[in-house]
A protein has these predicted regions:
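Negatively charged, low-complexity tracts enriched in Asp/Glu with abundant Ser/Thr
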Residues: 1-29, 83, 90-106
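Generic signature of intrinsically disordered, low-complexity, basic-rich segments
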Residues: 4, 21, 33, 43, ...
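Hydrophobic beta-strand residues in large extracellular and virion-surface proteins
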Residues: 16, 23-25, 38, 47, ...
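Functionally constrained cores in energy, signaling, and assembly domains
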Residues: 20-22, 26-27, 37, 59, ...
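Short aromatic-glycine-(Arg/Gly/Cys) micro-motifs in beta-strand/loop hairpins
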Residues: 30-54
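Mixed-charge, Lys/Arg-enriched low-complexity segments
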Residues: 50-107
């Protein structure tokens, strides 16, 4: 008999935000952390993380840069940042900034 519970996947929701020149992440608990920079040049946007060597190719909007960044993230990497980083201070409402919602598999 196989243990099916060990093969289940658990999707965990996250959000990324482009707040001015910063990239912020939010987990299901509502904790918001600073994870990198949003660079803009000649109408193109590039998301670059502070940890590791992760960056996106230039995109036409902050949302597209955030979406490109999602494909480079793993649950373990992002969850580790939430464990080690302190909460970011944000003035204003996060909902007013460009963002992308996504899920990462915990397994």
């Amino acid at each position: 008999m196989s243990d099916e519970s060990s093969q289940e996947s658990f999707e965990r929701p996250f959000r990324l935000f482009a707040v001015e020149e910063r990239v912020l992440a939010q987990n299901v608990d509502g904790k918001v952390i600073y994870i990198g920079a949003m660079e803009s040049k000649n109408g193109q946007f590039c998301a670059r993380l502070d940890s590791g060597d992760l960056a996106t190719e230039p995109r036409r909007s902050p949302e597209l840069a955030l979406k490109a960044l999602v494909g480079k993230l793993s649950f373990d990497y992002l969850d580790g940042l939430f464990t080690s980083e302190r909460e970011a201070e944000v003035s204003g409402r996060l909902q007013d900034y460009p963002s992308v919602e996504f899920e990462l598999d915990e397994s």
